[in-house]
Swiss-Prot record:
GO terms for molecular function: xanthine phosphoribosyltransferase activity. This is Xanthine phosphoribosyltransferase. It comes from Acinetobacter baumannii (strain ATCC 17978 / DSM 105126 / CIP 53.77 / LMG 1025 / NCDC KC755 / 5377). The lineage of its organism: Bacteria, Pseudomonadati, Pseudomonadota, Gammaproteobacteria, Moraxellales. The gene is xpt. It is found in: Cytoplasm. Pathway: Purine metabolism; XMP biosynthesis via salvage pathway; XMP from xanthine: step 1/1. Disulfide bonds: none annotated.
Amino acid sequence: MHALEQKILTEGIVLSDQVLKVDAFLNHQIDPVLMQQIGKEFAARFKDAGITKIITIEASGIAPAIMAGLELGVPVIFARKYQSLTLKDDLYRAKVFSFTKQTESTIAISNKHINSSDKALVIDDFLANGQAALGLIDLIHQANAEVVGVGIVIEKSFQPGRDLLLEKGYRVESLARVQSLADGTVTFVKE
């Protein structure tokens, strides 16, 4: 997605050869016009998948997931990372390891919002090692629902997440595929 790649080049900050900071438009401050374009792009790519639910993880996956849900006309469920007073019973749970934060957390969604008749699309902000996506897929499988694909805003193609998901048979659609962050420069996979 050209507009996203341009935004990464102009406003993204390479912190290391492994870490790209995009808090100017995605992870802290959110560019709503770009998010709307992202939602439309995900909707176009998955329009024939029969999606009934979009599943994401708090917090940075929520904005692109909401915009995709708006375009597709389907509800969005975000998995919580922390125990809540209002979300404590009848939960599907999975453990996920965050590459960026280097921590493991338990994510959860209520079993009242997803069931075996659902066709779910996973959407997340980044794909690195694939652990967040696999955790969300685990939650969907616990509900006996179908995973129709994984939509990623920014994929770090030099890390194993994409290959891991493809090997397990999942469709992966990434809007920006970063080939390298070497020498402080973002280069994209040529499609």
